[in-house]
C-alpha cells in the first residue's frame, strides 16, 4: 500500500516573536495552545503563506472582524513580520520518501501601504541531517545568529552535493511542483483554482459552513464531466473527418485572410518605414553634403564680405573725416554768408541812419534857430505881459484905493499909505534912500535910460551869442567827426589828426576801388584751387582703388589700358551670359526630363515587379511583350491538359470512395438494403457467416459462391415466401439460402477445384466456372485488405488530385496574373530602365551645376573686374581734364597772395564804407578846427548877467513909475477938491484900467499863443534831438557791430559767399550721399555678415547635427541592413517604387498600416509586444524584427499537411488553391455525417447516476460523524427539473426538434441551448450566448443541485445553515465537508499525477475552544481514519490527549518580545514524553 505524504515541520524565521522556530508536526493532530496574542494565528498564517503565496488571496483576520468591510481590513501579513528577510518553510516527506522543503522568502516593503514581497522556492535532495533553521540562518556566536538572504541561501545550498534549489517566478510553477511531488491534493493551474484552495483553507481555519463553499460544492466535489465529453466526442466521431476538413478550411480561410492582411499591412508598415529611412538616409547624406558645400561657400562669402566690410569701413572713416571737415567748412561758409548778409544789412542800416542823421542835423539846426527866435519873442512877450499885469494891478489897486477912499474917510490915508509903500519899494529897488515924490520923475527918467541901456546891451549880447553859438556848433561838429573816425583825442590835436585822416582816406579809397578786381581774381584762383584739390582727391581715391600709386604722366596710358580691358571684359560678360543661358537651358531640359522619368519610374518599377513575379512563378525570362503572349498561349494549353487529367483522377477517386463505402457496410454487404432484408427475414448474410474467413481462403470461397456471395441465409425458406410478394426495395438479384446460420457449411454445392478456379455444379445441366479473384472481397480480412489497398490508392489519388487541382488553380492564377500584367504593365515593362537614365541625368546635372557654379564665379570675377575697370575709367575721365591743375604747384601761393591783397583792399573798403561820409563832412569844416571858440561860455554868462540887469532895471523903472503915478497921493486938499479931482482921476484910472486890461488881454493872448508855439517848437526840437541821439546811438552800435562782424560788406561778397557755400554744400551732399551709400552698404554688409555668421553657425550646427545624425544613423542602418540581409527579407522590404514617395506619404502609409496591424495582432501577445516595441521611431531595426517575427509566426502557422512551403507569400497562393479542394471535399462528405442526441442524453444520465452513487458512498462515511446535537451529516444531490425535462426530450422526443440538430448553421452545443430555451421560455438567459449555454448543458454538474443536511436532535434532518447550528456544530460540520472535498480532489486528480504518490492531507482549525471534547475526539478519529493531518489552535484550557501540543507564551525581555514554546506528545495511551524546552532568540 502506498504511504501518504506527511508534513514534517514548519519553520518560521524572523517572524514577530519567532526568530528561528521549527514546529515538528504530528502525523495526525498538532495543537497550538496559548493565550491571546501568544502567536497561534501567526504560526498558522506562516503555514498558509507557504502553501499559497498569493498576496491577492492572503487575508489574515480575527474572527471579530467578520462584520467589517473588506476596505477597512488590514491584510494582516505585514504586521506579523519583522524588518529584514523572513522565511516560512515547510519540510515534507512524500509517498516516495523524498524530502522536499518548500517555502517563501518574505520581506516588508517600505511605504505607507504596508506591502510585502514574497518569493517562493523549493529545495530537493536535502539530507535529513540538515535542519531548516541551520539552513536558513548563520550562527555568529553563542547568542547571535544572522538570517541569510535568498541569494546567500542559494549559494550555500549549491555547495552541498545533490541538493537542488529552485526559485519560482510564478505561483503556478510553484504549485505545479508541489502537485507533482504530492504536497497539494489538486493541480492549481489558475487563480481560480488557487482561490478555491484558499477558500477551503480559510473555511477550515475559521470554521463553520462557508456560504461560498456551500454554493460551490458542485465545483469542489463533482469531477469534470469526462463521460459527457466522451459521449460528445463519440457522438461526433462520425463527423471528425468532416470537422477536420471544415477546420482545415476555416484555418486555411482565416490563415489566408490573416496572411494576406498581415503580409500586406506588415509589408506596408515596415517597407514604408524602411524605404523612408533609406530615403531619409539618402536625403540626410545629400543634406550633409549640401550643408558642407554651403558651409564652405558661406565661409568664402563671409571672408569676402569681411574684406569688403573692412574696405568700406575704411572708406567710411575717410568719408566721415572728410564730412567733418566739409561740415565745418560748410558751416563756416554758411556762417560767413550769414555774416556777409548781416554785414550788408548792417551797412544798409548804417547808410540809411547816416542819411537820416544828416537830415536830422539840418532840421535840428533849423529848429534850434526857430526855437531861439521864439524864445526871445517869448521873453519879450513875457516882459510885456508882466508889465501889463503890473499896470493892471496897479490901476486896480489905485482904483480900489480910490473907491475905498470914496467909501470911507480913510481912503486918502490908504492911498497915501500905498503911495508911501510904493515910494519905499522904489527906494529899495532903486537903492535910493533919499528918493522923494518930487524927485521921482527925475530918477524915473534916469532909470528908464538905464533900462534902455540894459536892453540895448542885452540885444547886442544876444547877437554876439547867436554868432558864437554858430561857430561853436561847427567846431563841435568837426571835432565829433574826428573823434568818430580816430577815437578820443585832445581838442588841440583835432586839426592835425583831421588832416591825416583826410590824406589817408584818399589812399583807402584807392585801395577800396581794387576790391572787386581782386575778388574776381581770387574767386577764379580759389575755383582752380578747389578743382586741383578735387583732382588730387579723385587721384588719391583712384590710386587707392587701383591698389598702387600712379604718376600723373601715366594716367593717360592707364586710361587707354582700362578702356581696352573694358572692351574685352564686355565681350567676355556678354559671351558668359549666352553660355550661362545655354547651360541653364540644358539644366532645365535635364530637370524636365528627370521629372518625367521620376513620374514614369514608379509605374516602370511596378511593371518590373509584376514581371519579376511572373518570371519567378513560371521560371522564364521575358525579353519582349511577344514572349509574354506566347507563354500565355502555352499556359492555356497546359491548363486544358491539367483539367482533363484532374477530372480523370477525380472520377477514379470517387469510384474508390464508393467502393470503400460499399466494402465498409456491416457484415460485408455490398448493398445496405441487404442488412434490412436480413433483419426482416430473420436471416443472416452469407458474408457475415464467412466474415472470419482468412485471407488465404477468401479467393476460394469467393469463387465458390460466385454471384451468391451476397445471399441471405434463412432457417426456413417457406416462411419467407409470402414476404417476397410485393418486395420492391431490394437488389435486382436476391439470393436466399436455407440453412442454420449457427452451423452453416458449404455442402450445398457440388464443387470441383481446379488450378486457381472452381467448377460449381449448380444442377445437372448447369455448371458455373469461377476463377479465383485477383482481389477477393469475401470475408472481413479480404475486405479489410482491399479497403487498405483502396485507402492507399485513394491517398495517392487524393494527393495527385490535390496536386493537379493545385496546378490547375496555380495555372489559372498565373493566367490571371499574365492577363493583369498584359492589361496594366505590358506597355511600359519592356522600356529602358528610367532609374539608370535618371542616374545618368543626375550625373550630368551635377556636372552642369558645377559648370554653372564655376561659370558664375568666373562671371562674377569678370563682372567685378568690369565694374572696377568702368569705375577706374570714370574716375580717370574726371581726373584727366584737370591734369594741368595737378601740375600747377604755385596755385596755392598765388591764392594766398591775392587773398592778402584782397584783405587789405577789403579793410580799406570797410574803412571807406564806415568813415567815408564822415570824411566828406569833415573836409569842408576842416578850417573850423584851427581855432577853438572857448569864449562862448563867458559870453553866455555875460548874456545871462545882462538879462538880469535888464530885468532889474525894468523893475526899478516900474517902481519909480508907480511912485510917480502915486505922487498925488502925497498931498490931498480938502474932500470937495479931492472928490472933483478924484472923479477925474477915477475916470482916468478907469479909462486907463480898461486900456491896461485890454493890453493885458492882448499880451496874454500873444503870450499864450507864442508859448504854445514855443512849446511846439521845443517839442519838435526835443523830438529831433531824441531822434538824432537815438539814431546816432544806433549808428554807433551798428558801426560797432559791423566792426565786430569783421566782414567786408561789398557788393560781390554775398555772391561769393553764396557760391562758396553752395559748392561746399554740393561737396557735403555728395560726401553724405556717398557716406549714406557706404553706411547702407556697410549696414547691408554687416547684416549680410551677421546673416552669414548666423547662417554659418546654423550651417555648422546643422552640418554637425546632420553629420552626427548620419554617423549615428549609419550604425543603426548597418544593423538594419545586416538584420534585413540575415533574415532574407530585403527583397520584400526594398520596394523601389516607394522611393519616389515623400516622407509624409510614407509615414502616412506606415501609420495606416500600423493602425490596421494593432487589431490584427491584438490576440497574439508576442506579435503585439513586438509591434508595440517597433513603434519606437528611434529603433528602426525593431520594425525589421517585427517583420521577421510576422514571417516566423506565419511560417509556424503554415499547416505542412496542407501547404508545403515556408514562404508565407507563397502560402497565401497555396491556401487559396487548397481552399477550393477542401471545400469540395467537405461538400461531398457533409451528407454522410449524422449526430445522435439520444446517446448524449443517456451518457449524461449515466454520469449523473454514477456521481449520485459516489456521493452516497461519501455519505456513508459521514453518517458516523457527530458534533454536539448533530448526530449525522449527509449530502443531497438532486436533478433540476428543467434539466430533467431536457434529458427526457433528448432521449424520447428528439425527432420533434430535428430542425435544430440538422441545421448547418448551428453546432450541437448551440442546438442544445436553443432546445433548452424552447423548453424553458420562462428562464432568463441574460447576456450569455447559445454556445456558452450549450457548453454548460453538456456539463452534467449543471444538471444537479447539492445541499448539506444534518441530523440534529429532535429536529431530524435539517439543511445545514449557520443560523440553525451552534458555532461548534457549524465548525464540525464544515470540517467534515472539507474532508470530503479533499478526498474528492484526490480521487479526481489521481489520474493526473504518478500512481505511486498519495498526496498530503492537512487542514486547520482556529479557536478550537468552541468544540467540546467529543467533537475534538471525533476530529481525531476522522484524521486517523483518513490519514489526515490537522493543526488546531486552542486556548490553554484545551489539552488534547493525542497528537502533539505546543504551549506558546509571549514574553517581553529587555524590551525584546519573543514567544516561549514548549512541545508535548500525546499522553492518553502512554506516559507523556516531554520534549526539550526551546526558547527563541529574537
Curated annotation (Swiss-Prot):
Query: Does this entry carry the keyword ATP-binding?
Result: yes
Biological process terms from the Gene Ontology for this record are: cell division; chromosome condensation; chromosome segregation; DNA replication
Which stretches does the entry tag as region Flexible hinge? 666-783
InterPro entries per record: MukB, MukB/SMC, MukB_hinge, MukB_hinge_sf, MukB_N_dom, P-loop_NTPase
One GO CC term, this protein: nucleoid
Q: Which GO terms describe its molecular function?
A: ATP binding; DNA binding
Q: Which portions of this protein are annotated as coiled-coil regions?
A: 326-416, 509-603, 780-805, 835-923, 979-1116, 1210-1265
Give the signal sequence positions: none
Tell me where in or outside the cell this protein is found: Cytoplasm, Nucleoid
Return the SUPFAM superfamilies for the record. P-loop containing nucleoside triphosphate hydrolases (SSF52540)
Binding-site residues, ATP: 34-41
Keywords, A to Z, come to:
ATP-binding, Cell cycle, Cell division, Chromosome partition, Coiled coil, Cytoplasm, DNA condensation, DNA-binding, Nucleotide-binding
Q: Which family does it belong to?
A: Belongs to the SMC family. MukB subfamily.
Oligomer status and interactors: Homodimerization via its hinge domain. Binds to DNA via its C-terminal region. Interacts, and probably forms a ternary complex, with MukE and MukF via its C-terminal region. The complex formation is stimulated by calcium or magnesium. Interacts with tubulin-related protein FtsZ.
* Domain comment (free text): The hinge domain, which separates the large intramolecular coiled coil regions, allows the homodimerization, forming a V-shaped homodimer.
Q: What does this protein do?
A: Plays a central role in chromosome condensation, segregation and cell cycle progression. Functions as a homodimer, which is essential for chromosome partition. Involved in negative DNA supercoiling in vivo, and by this means organize and compact chromosomes. May achieve or facilitate chromosome segregation by condensation DNA from both sides of a centrally located replisome during cell division.
**Protein name according to UniProt:** Chromosome partition protein MukB
Which gene specifies this protein's sequence?
mukB
Amino acid at each position: 500500500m502506498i504511504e501518504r505524504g506527511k508534513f514534517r515541520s514548519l519553520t518560521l524565521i524572523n517572524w514577530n516573536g519567532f526568530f528561528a522556530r521549527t514546529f515538528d508536526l504530528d502525523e495526525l493532530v498538532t495543537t497550538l495552545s496559548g493565550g491571546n496574542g501568544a502567536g497561534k494565528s501567526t504560526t498558522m498564517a506562516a503555514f498558509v503563506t507557504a502553501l499559497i503565496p498569493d498576496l491577492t488571496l492572503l487575508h489574515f483576520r480575527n474572527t471579530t472582524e467578520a462584520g467589517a468591510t473588506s476596505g477597512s481590513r488590514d491584510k494582516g501579513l505585514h504586521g506579523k513580520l519583522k524588518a529584514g528577510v523572513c522565511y516560512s518553510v515547510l519540510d515534507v516527506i512524500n509517498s516516495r520518501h523524498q524530502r522536499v522543503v518548500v517555502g517563501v522568502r518574505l520581506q516588508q516593503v517600505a511605504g505607507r501601504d504596508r506591502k510585502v514581497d514574497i518569493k517562493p522556492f523549493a529545495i530537493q535532495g536535502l539530507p535529513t541531517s540538515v535542519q531548516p533553521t541551520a539552513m536558513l540562518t548563520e550562527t555568529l556566536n553563542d547568542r547571535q545568529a544572522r538570517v541569510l538572504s535568498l541569494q546567500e541561501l542559494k549559494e550555500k545550498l549549491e555547495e552541498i552535493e545533490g541538493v537542488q534549489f529552485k526559485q519560482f517566478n510564478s505561483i503556478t510553477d510553484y504549485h505545479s511542483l508541489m502537485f507533482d511531488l504530492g504536497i497539494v491534493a489538486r493541480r492549481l493551474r489558475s487563480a481560480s483554482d488557487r482561490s478555491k484552495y484558499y477558500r477551503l483553507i480559510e473555511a477550515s481555519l475559521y470554521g463553520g459552513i462557508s456560504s461560498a463553499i456551500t454554493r460551490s460544492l458542485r465545483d469542489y466535489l463533482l469531477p469534470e464531466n469526462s463521460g459527457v465529453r466522451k459521449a460528445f466526442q463519440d457522438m461526433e466521431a462520425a463527423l471528425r473527418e468532416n470537422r477536420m476538413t471544415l477546420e482545415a478550411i476555416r484555418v486555411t480561410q482565416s490563415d489566408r485572410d490573416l496572411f494576406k492582411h498581415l503580409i500586406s499591412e506588415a509589408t506596408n508598415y515596415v517597407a514604408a518605414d524602411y524605404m523612408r529611412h533609406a530615403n531619409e538616409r539618402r536625403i540626410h547624406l545629400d543634406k550633409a553634403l549640401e550643408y558642407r558645400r554651403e558651409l564652405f561657400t558661406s565661409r568664402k562669402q563671409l571672408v569676402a564680405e569681411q574684406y569688403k566690410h573692412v574696405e568700406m569701413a575704411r572708406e567710411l572713416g575717410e568719408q566721415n573725416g572728410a564730412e567733418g571737415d566739409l561740415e565745418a567748412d560748410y558751416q563756416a561758409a554758411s556762417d560767413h554768408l550769414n555774416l556777409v548778409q548781416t554785414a550788408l544789412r548792417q551797412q544798409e542800416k548804417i547808410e540809411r541812419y547816416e542819411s537820416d542823421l544828416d537830415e536830422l542835423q539840418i532840421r535840428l539846426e533849423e529848429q534850434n534857430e526857430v526855437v531861439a527866435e521864439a524864445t526871445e519873442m517869448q521873453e519879450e512877450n513875457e516882459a510885456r505881459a508882466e508889465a501889463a499885469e503890473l499896470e493892471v494891478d496897479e490901476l486896480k489897486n489905485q482904483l480900489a484905493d480910490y473907491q475905498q477912499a470914496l467909501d470911507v474917510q480913510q481912503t486918502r490915508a490908504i492911498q497915501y499909505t500905498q503911495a508911501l509903500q510904493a515910494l519905499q519899494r522904489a527906494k529899495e529897488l532903486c537903492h535910493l534912500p533919499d528918493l522923494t515924490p518930487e524927485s521921482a520923475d527925475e530918477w524915473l527918467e534916469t532909470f528908464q535910460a538905464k533900462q534902455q541901456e540894459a536892453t540895448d546891451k542885452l540885444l547886442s549880447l544876444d547877437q554876439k551869442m547867436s554868432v558864437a553859438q554858430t561857430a561853436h556848433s561847427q567846431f563841435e561838429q568837426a571835432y565829433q567827426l574826428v573823434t568818430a573816425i580816430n577815437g578820443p583825442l585832445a581838442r588841440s590835436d583835432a586839426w592835425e589828426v583831421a588832416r591825416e585822416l583826410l590824406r589817408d582816406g584818399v589812399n583807402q579809397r584807392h585801395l577800396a576801388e581794387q576790391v572787386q578786381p581782386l575778388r574776381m581774381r581770387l574767386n577764379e584762383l580759389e575755383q582752380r584751387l578747389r578743382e586741383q584739390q578735387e583732382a588730387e582727391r579723385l587721384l588719391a581715391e583712384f590710386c587707392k582703388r587701383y591698389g598702387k600709386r600712379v604718376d600723373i604722366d601715366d594716367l593717360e596710358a592707364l586710361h587707354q589700358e582700362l578702356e581696352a580691358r573694358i572692351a574685352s571684359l564686355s565681350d567676355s560678360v556678354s559671351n558668359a551670359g549666352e553660355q550661362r543661358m545655354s547651360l541653364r537651358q540644358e539644366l532645365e531640359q535635364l530637370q524636365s526630363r528627370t521629372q518625367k522619368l521620376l513620374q514614369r519610374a514608379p509605374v516602370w518599377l511596378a511593371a518590373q515587379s509584376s514581371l519579376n513575379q511572373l518570371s519567378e512563378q513560371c521560371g522564364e525570362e521575358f525579353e519582349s511583350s511577344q514572349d509574354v503572349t506566347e507563354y500565355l498561349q502555352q499556359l492555356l494549353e497546359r491548363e486544358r491538359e491539367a483539367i482533363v487529367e484532374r477530372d480523370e483522377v477525380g472520377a477514379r477517386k470517387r469510384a474508390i470512395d464508393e467502393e470503400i463505402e460499399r466494402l465498409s457496410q456491416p457484415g460485408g454487404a455490398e448493398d445496405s438494403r441487404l442488412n434490412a432484408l436480413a433483419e426482416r427475414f430473420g436471416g443472416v448474410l452469407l458474408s457475415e457467416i464467412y466474415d472470419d474467413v482468412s485471407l488465404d481462403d477468401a479467393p476460394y470461397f469467393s469463387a465458390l459462391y460466385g454471384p451468391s456471395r451476397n445471399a441471405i441465409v434463412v432457417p426456413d425458406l417457406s416462411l419467407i415466401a409470402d414476404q417476397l410478394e410485393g418486395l420492391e426495395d431490394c437488389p435486382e438479384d436476391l439470393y436466399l439460402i436455407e440453412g442454420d446460420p449457427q452451423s452453416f457449411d458449404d455442402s450445398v454445392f457440388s464443387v470441383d477445384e481446379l488450378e486457381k478456379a472452381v467448377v460449381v455444379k449448380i444442377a445437372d445441366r448447369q455448371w458455373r466456372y469461377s476463377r479465383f479473384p485477383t482481389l477477393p472481397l469475401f470475408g472481413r480480412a479480404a475486405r479489410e485488405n482491399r479497403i487498405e489497398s483502396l485507402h492507399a490508392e485513394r491517398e495517392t489519388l487524393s494527393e495527385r488530385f490535390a496536386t493537379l487541382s493545385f496546378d490547375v488553380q496555380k495555372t489559372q492564377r498565373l493566367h490571371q496574373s499574365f492577363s493583369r500584367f498584359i492589361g496594366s504593365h505590358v506597355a511600359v515593362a519592356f522600356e529602358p530602365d528610367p532609374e539608370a537614365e535618371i542616374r545618368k541625368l543626375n550625373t550630368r546635372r551635377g556636372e552642369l551645376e558645377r559648370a554653372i557654379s564655376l561659370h558664375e564665379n568666373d562671371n562674377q570675377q569678370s563682372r567685378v573686374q568690369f565694374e572696377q575697370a568702368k569705375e577706374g575709367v570714370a574716375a580717370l575721365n574726371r581726373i584727366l581734364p584737370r591734369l594741368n591743375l595737378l601740375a600747377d604747384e604755385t596755385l596755392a601761393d598765388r591764392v594766398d597772395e591775392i587773398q592778402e591783397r584782397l584783405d587789405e583792399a577789403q579793410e580799406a573798403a570797410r574803412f571807406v564804407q564806415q568813415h567815408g561820409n564822415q570824411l566828406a563832412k569833415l573836409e569842408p569844416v576842416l578850417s573850423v578846427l584851427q581855432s577853438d571858440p572857448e569864449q562862448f561860455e563867458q559870453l553866455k554868462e555875460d548874456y545871462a548877467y545882462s538879462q538880469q540887469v535888464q530885468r532889474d532895471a525894468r523893475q526899478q523903472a516900474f517902481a519909480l513909475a508907480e511912485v510917480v503915478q502915486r505922487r498925488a497921493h502925497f498931498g490931498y486938499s480938502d474932500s470937495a477938491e479931492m472928490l472933483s479931482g478924484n472923479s477925474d482921476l477915477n475916470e482916468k484910472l478907469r479909462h486907463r484900467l480898461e486900456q491896461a486890461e485890454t493890453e493885458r488881454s492882448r499880451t496874454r493872448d500873444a503870450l499864450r499863443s507864442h508859448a504854445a508855439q514855443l512849446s511846439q517848437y521845443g517839442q519838435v526840437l526835443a523830438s529831433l534831438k531824441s531822434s538824432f541821439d537815438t539814431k546816432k546811438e544806433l549808428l554807433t552800435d551798428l558801426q560797432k557791430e559791423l566792426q565786430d562782424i569783421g566782414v567786408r560788406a561789398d557788393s560781390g561778397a554775398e555772391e561769393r559767399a553764396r557760391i562758396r557755400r553752395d559748392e561746399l554744400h554740393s561737396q557735403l551732399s555728395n560726401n553724405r550721399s556717398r557716406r549714406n551709400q557706404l553706411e547702407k552698404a556697410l549696414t547691408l554688409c554687416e547684416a549680410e555678415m551677421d546673416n552669414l555668421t548666423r547662417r554659418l553657425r546654423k550651417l555648422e550646427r546643422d552640418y554637425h547635427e546632420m553629420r552626427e545624425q548620419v554617423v549615428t544613423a549609419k550604425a543603426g542602418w548597418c544593423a538594419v541592413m545586416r538584420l534585413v540581409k540575415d533574415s532574407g527579407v530585403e527583397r520584400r522590404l526594398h520596394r523601389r517604387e516607394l522611393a519616389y514617395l515623400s516622407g509624409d506619404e510614407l509615414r502616412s502609409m506606415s501609420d495606416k498600416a500600423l493602425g490596421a496591424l494593432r487589431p490584427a495582432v491584438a490576440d497574439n501577445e508576442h506579435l503585439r509586444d513586438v509591434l508595440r516595441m517597433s513603434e519606437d521611431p528611434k529603433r528602426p531595426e525593431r520594425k525589421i524584427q517585427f517583420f521577421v517575427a510576422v514571417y516566423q509566426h506565419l511560417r509556424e502557422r503554415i499547416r505542412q499537411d496542407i501547404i508545403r512551403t515556408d514562404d508565407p507569400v507563397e502560402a497565401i497562393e497555396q491556401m487559396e488553391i487548397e481552399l477550393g479542394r477542401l471545400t469540395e471535399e467537405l461538400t461531398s462528405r457533409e451528407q454522410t455525417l449524422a449526430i445522435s442526441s439520444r446517446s448524449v442524453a443517456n451518457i449524461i444520465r449515466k454520469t449523473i447516476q454514477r456521481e449520485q452513487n459516489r456521493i452516497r458512498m461519501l455519505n456513508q462515511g459521514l453518517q458516523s460523524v457527530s458534533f454536539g446535537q448533530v448526530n449525522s451529516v449527509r449530502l443531497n444531490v438532486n436533478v433540476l427539473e428543467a434539466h430533467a425535462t431536457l434529458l427526457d426530450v433528448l432521449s424520447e422526443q428528439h425527432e420533434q426538434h430535428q430542425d435544430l440538430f440538422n441545421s448547418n448553421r448551428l453546432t450541437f452545443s448551440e442546438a442544445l441551448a436553443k432546445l433548452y430555451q424552447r423548453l424553458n421560455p420562462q428562464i432568463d438567459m441574460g447576456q450569455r450566448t447559445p454556445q456558452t449555454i450549450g457548453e454548460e448543458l453538456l456539463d452534467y454538474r449543471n444538471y444537479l443541485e447539492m445541499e448539506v443536511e444534518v441530523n440534529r436532535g429532535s429536529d431530524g434532518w435539517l439543511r445545514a445553515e449557520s443560523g440553525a447550528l451552534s458555532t461548534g456544530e457549524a465548525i464540525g460540520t464544515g470540517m467534515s465537508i472539507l474532508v470530503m472535498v479533499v478526498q474528492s480532489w484526490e480521487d479526481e486528480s489521481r489520474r493526473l499525477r504518478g500512481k505511486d504518490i498519495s498526496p498530503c492531507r492537512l487542514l486547520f482549525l482556529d479557536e478550537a475552544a468552541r468544540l467540546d471534547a467529543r467533537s475534538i475526539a471525533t476530529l481525531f478519529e476522522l484524521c486517523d481514519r483518513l490519514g489526515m493531518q490537522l493543526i488546531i489552535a486552542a486556548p490553554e484550557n484545551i489539552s488534547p490527549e493525542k497528537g502533539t501540543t505546543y504551549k506558546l507564551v509571549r514574553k517581553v525581555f529587555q524590551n525584546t518580545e519573543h514567544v516561549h514554546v514548549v512541545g508535548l506528545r500525546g499522553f492518553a495511551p502512554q506516559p507523556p514524553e516531554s520534549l526539550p524546552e526551546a526558547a527563541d532568540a529574537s
